[in-house]
């Protein structure tokens, strides 16, 4: 049996760090421009020299999952909450559109009122979507 990845599930994940604040109001966009923002810490590590997002765009591009999509990619299930204030729901939309453009199988759900984590992600409806996706892909 193959050990290659046969299915992928992305729940409120990042896809393009250069557009991390897409769809957010200005006050949230400003938070993403700081050297202490989660994405700046993820890519640059703790900043001792004042490097932040505006300085690290090349690093951000190299870390973007959308830059590594090819035709051999497995089916994707993308889920995001429309009330997520940590990662913009546009992130799964960007990835979904890039996957479709590359000819991959991608399904995206937006969960109403769901934030980044929390009780909304433990709903039976969400679990059912995930189980049905995995059964549909892995039990063929």
Regions found by a protein language model. Give the residues of each.
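Primarily recognizes the serine-hydrolase "nucleophile elbow" in alpha/beta-hydrolase
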Residues: 1-27, 136
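Acidic beta-to-alpha connecting loop that harbors the catalytic carboxylate
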Residues: 14, 82-84, 113-115
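Conserved alpha/beta-hydrolase "acid-adjacent" motif
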Residues: 85-94
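Catalytic histidine-centered segment of alpha/beta-hydrolase-like enzymes
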Residues: 114-123
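Catalytic active-site module of serine/aspartate enzymes centered on a nucleophile-bearing elbow/loop
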Residues: 123-140
């Amino acid at each position: 049996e193959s050990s290659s990845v046969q299915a992928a599930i992305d729940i409120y994940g990042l896809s393009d760090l250069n557009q991390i604040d897409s769809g957010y109001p200005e006050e949230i966009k400003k938070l993403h421009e700081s050297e202490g923002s989660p994405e700046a810490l993820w890519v640059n590590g703790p900043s001792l020299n004042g490097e932040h997002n505006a300085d690290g765009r090349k690093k951000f591009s190299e870390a973007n999952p959308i830059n590594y999509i090819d035709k051999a990619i497995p089916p994707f299930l993308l889920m995001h909450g429309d009330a997520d204030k940590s990662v913009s729901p546009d992130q799964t939309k960007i990835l979904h559109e890039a996957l479709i453009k590359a000819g991959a199988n991608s399904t995206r759900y937006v969960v109403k009122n769901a934030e980044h984590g929390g009780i909304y992600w433990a709903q039976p409806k969400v679990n059912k979507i995930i189980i049905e996706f995995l059964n549909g892909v892995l039990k063929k």
